[in-house]
């Protein structure tokens, strides 16, 4: 055994393994388009009023298959805007039955025009503008939220 594998280090390896096993997976959204394979999106969670108000403001880039998931305490008509947001986004409104009820496509950066869900929604997913068109995502598609830590109400 080389000097870099001291007995002390070997004692900590099981602890390191246990910590790694207990780490929670990255939150993600799975979208099931009516035509095509499931789409996996890694998400940041906006689950407080402060996080929901700030959203993706001031972000200059967003990797493909990444987004922000907004969690609301109840299902109701939601409205978004693009104030201080330099990226065009697709805003996907999802109801409590995990069905897409509306999509605001290729939103205009920095616009203060309200973009309402039109129908009650409890979750909202923001992804890059054009994402829904590129991946065939439509109103009526189903969604799953595995590994999403829901806040306690």
Language-model-derived ranges and their functions:
Residues 14-15:
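Residue-level signal for mature regions of secreted extracellular proteins and peptides
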Residues 18-20:
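C-terminal motif of bacterial Sec signal peptides marking the signal peptidase cleavage site
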Residues 1-10:
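Bacterial N-terminal signal peptides that target proteins for export
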